[in-house]
From Swiss-Prot:
GO terms for molecular function: phospholipase A2 activity; toxin activity. Its EC number is 3.1.1.4. Snake venom phospholipase A2 (PLA2) that inhibits collagen-, ADP-, thrombin-, ionophore-, adrenaline-, ristocetin-, and arachidonic acid-induced platelet aggregation. Inhibits serotonin release. PLA2 catalyzes the calcium-dependent hydrolysis of the 2-acyl groups in 3-sn-phosphoglycerides. It comes from Austrelaps superbus (Lowland copperhead snake). Expressed by the venom gland. It is an enzyme of class 3 (hydrolase). One of its GO terms (cellular component) is extracellular region. This is Phospholipase A2. It comes from the Eukaryota. It catalyses: a 1,2-diacyl-sn-glycero-3-phosphocholine + H2O = a 1-acyl-sn-glycero-3-phosphocholine + a fatty acid + H(+). Its cofactor is Ca(2+).
Length: 17
């Protein structure tokens, strides 16, 4: 589930940018 957590952060990171 670590990948899922990182995936969520990555998606939010792009949205914030």
């Amino acid at each position: 589930n670590l990948i899922q957590f990182a995936n969520m952060i990555g998606c939010a990171n792009h949205g914030s940018r």
